[in-house]
Structures are given as C-alpha cells and as structure tokens.
Amino acid sequence: MIQGGDPQGTGYGGSDENIKGEFTSNGFPNKLSHKRGVISMARSQDPDSASSQFFICHKDCPFLDGDYAAFGTMTDGFDTLDEIADIPTDPMDRPFEEQRIKTVTVE
C-alpha cells in the first residue's frame, strides 16, 4: 500500500480532530473491499483515530476489510500507482525521494 496525508511529513502527523472509524468491527457497515486501487483511512490502534492520513491499496488487502474505513476507488492512474510502489524506500518504507499527489478528481 501507499500511505500519505501527513501534513508534517513525518508519518505521525494529522489534524487536531479524529474521525469515527466507519467499518464493520466498529459498528458501521462498510462493504467496500480493500482491493487494488481502493482508498482507505489510515489510523493507529484506536479505531476512532483516523485523521488526515490515508492509504491506497497497491494490491488486494482483504485482511483490512472490516477494520479500516475504505471510502473510495481509483478509476485510472494505475500505471502511476505501480511506479510509486516501485520507488526505493528506506527501512521504514518511506521513499528516499518525496512523492506528491499533484491532482485529484472526485466524482
């Protein structure tokens, strides 16, 4: 998976507010499966700790279903997803070279 959305760029940042986790194990029906291209909220161990960070599934991740709030699906750009997934990373899986999302379209 590819994770982003940290305003501090450290991997630990977020906003001042958290979002209630909208997934099955937290009492909210969410039938969107974590398949390749699905976008979901990142969080800590606390199910209601989602903030600004999100991740995009590079491969199918069915083990996340029911425990993470999937909320969107990519419709194109899978070649870019593959390119980002192939970028060299450090031992903490952070890319050596910063990656940025330049445009997003929500439909």
Where are these regions (language model features)?
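Cyclophilin-like peptidyl-prolyl cis-trans isomerases
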Residues: 1-107
